[in-house]
Amino acid sequence: MTKKKAHKPGSATIAQNKRARFEYAIEEEFEAGLSLQGWEVKSLRAGKANISDSYVTFRDGEAYLFGATVSPLNVASSHVVCDPTRTRKLLLKKRELDSLLGRVNRDGYTVVALSMYWKNAWAKIKIGVAKGKKEHDKRDDIKDREWQTAKSRIMKHANR
């Protein structure tokens, strides 16, 4: 028997944070590289990552990803002590780092992880500069989404 793939063969997406788009209003998106260890790369290839509660913090002029979980494989990480929730350094250009740091410190924004994916052979993470939504904003989004589905359903039946 063959093993079930963790993600679609043609898909480069490793993990998504769907909750972030609901909880936050995303202003701007950046692509960052990840500083990973060998066992983490193998686990990411198997699709064993979770970024649902992850966010970015800044220390000493560097950006770090907190809260992302990469579950170790049993066979790949038998000789190494694995920490699934360790902080991982993000690889960004200096201008992008300064822009992110300025917006977080001045304007009250936060930086959240949106998705993790493969770009060629490199693991990348899409991060977004976000501001938290209020409860009524979330309700408005739900109403708009429901109206769009109802409208498409009406148009589908009207064209028959």
Swiss-Prot record:
Record InterPro entries: SmpB, SsrA-bd_prot, SsrA-bd_prot_CS
SUPFAM superfamilies, alphabetized: Small protein B (SmpB)
PROSITE patterns: SSRP (PS01317)
Intracellular or extracellular location(s): Cytoplasm
Gene3D superfamilies xrefs: 2.40.280.10
Biased composition (Basic and acidic residues): 138-148
BP-aspect Gene Ontology terms: trans-translation
Region described as Disordered: 138-160
Record keywords, A-Z: Cytoplasm, RNA-binding
Major location category of this protein: cytoplasm
Pfam family, one: SmpB
One CC-aspect GO term: cytosol
Record carries keyword Metal-binding: no
Top-rank taxon: Bacteria
GO molecular-function term, one example from the UniProt record: RNA binding
Cystine residue pairs: none
Family statement: Belongs to the SmpB family.
Described function: Required for rescue of stalled ribosomes mediated by trans-translation. Binds to transfer-messenger RNA (tmRNA), required for stable association of tmRNA with ribosomes. tmRNA and SmpB together mimic tRNA shape, replacing the anticodon stem-loop with SmpB. tmRNA is encoded by the ssrA gene; the 2 termini fold to resemble tRNA(Ala) and it encodes a 'tag peptide', a short internal open reading frame. During trans-translation Ala-aminoacylated tmRNA acts like a tRNA, entering the A-site of stalled ribosomes, displacing the stalled mRNA.
NCBIfam families assigned to the protein according to its UniProt record, in alphabetical order: PRK05422.1 (NF003843), smpB (TIGR00086)
Protein name: SsrA-binding protein
Species in which this protein is naturally found: Serratia proteamaculans (strain 568)
